[in-house]
Amino acid sequence: MFDRRLLQYFDWGLLALASIIGGIGLFTLYSAVTAETPEPQKIIFYKQLIWFSAALFAMTVSFSINYKLLDRWGQVLYIGCILLLVWVLFFGKYVGGSRRWLILGPVSVQPSELAKIAVMIVLARYYSKDANTRGHTLRELFRPAVLTLIPFFLIVRQPDLGTAGLLLLIAGSITLFVKIERRSLIYLMVSGAAVVPLVWFFLKEYQKRRILVFLDPDLDPLGAGYHIIQSKIAIGSGMISGKGFLQGTQNALSFLPEEHTDFIFSVLAEEWGFIGSVVLVLLFLLLIFWGLKIAQGCREPFGTILAVGITSMIFWQVIINIGMTMGLMPVVGVPLPLVSYGGSSVLTTAIGIGLLMNVSMRRFMLE
């Protein structure tokens, strides 16, 4: 139940930051699906408005309940998420060569998005109860590794390498934060470096092509490299101040693929230029800094680790998505938080921000 005393500690700054980024996202999405596009395409924008309304409700719930209840129910949430990931492999909606979505009446959801929150909670639960100032050994890291790898492999099977890789980055960020024994860290780094080249042999052909065209888009300029080339043209053509709202030609002439999801940053960069791009990046950096300050000010380990996990989720999504659009990273289908179209992504981010607010408010409460 919501404690009314917490209202005096409500984090209005965090809410304002998230609202501004979300507002920029809606304006950019409107442009992406409106400029010289057929009327049916505009329904994407109206769907996103509905998802934002649902996200507002989800955020309200997530900051209203005591986040410490997640410590108690974390395992149940995790198991439920694993069951959903198994279910989607057999009964999920098959789109574009992957099976990632569960159909729930008129809407579809991605359990892999919810898996990010579930893994954060169980890792925060484990590390908060197994504090180790000298650093965790390989033996102590075995259980959190298993908790991470189970959903990881289920997501890889869909296949969705972008979300699976993001899950590893979030888990890795949390684990580095709680500290790893030096010898164990060196062993993990060497082992990881040895395993990475072997991953190539397990990739599907289209995944290999994405990596190759990331290294040289001109290898397939009309195929796998087309996305990156057109995205870089859009970003570069925006120059300093951009072409103006609804004036982006790459988007309007349908040169830019996936303009409302993976490459929405390219739409923003073309219309608002370098200045608009920097403003959005600075807003994200401020949001990340805000999350880390909340983690630093928390008085107990579970809340601290949870805040670090949520902040790392936002950080890595921003890095990967913007990196994709600029040709600095392979195209792996990771959305830009609160900007890209996608109900599951918006809900997950809203829940995460709500939990950050939760930790922020309750850190001031006297024990």
Specify the residue positions occupied by each region the protein language model found.
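TM-adjacent membrane-interface loops and short helices in multi-pass inner/ER membrane proteins
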Residues: 213, 217-261, 272-276
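Transmembrane helix boundary and interhelical junction motifs in multipass membrane proteins
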Residues: 160-165, 243-248, 259-261, 278, ...
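A juxtamembrane structural motif centered on a specific transmembrane helix
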Residues: 1-2, 321-367
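N-terminal membrane topogenic signal
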Residues: 1-18
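Hydrophobic alpha-helical transmembrane segments of multi-pass inner membrane proteins, especially
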Residues: 15-31, 35-227, 266-326, 351-355
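Glycine/serine-rich anion-binding loops at beta->alpha junctions
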Residues: 105-115, 157-159, 239-243, 334-348
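Positively charged n-region of N-terminal signal peptides that target proteins for export
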Residues: 2-4, 72, 183, 367
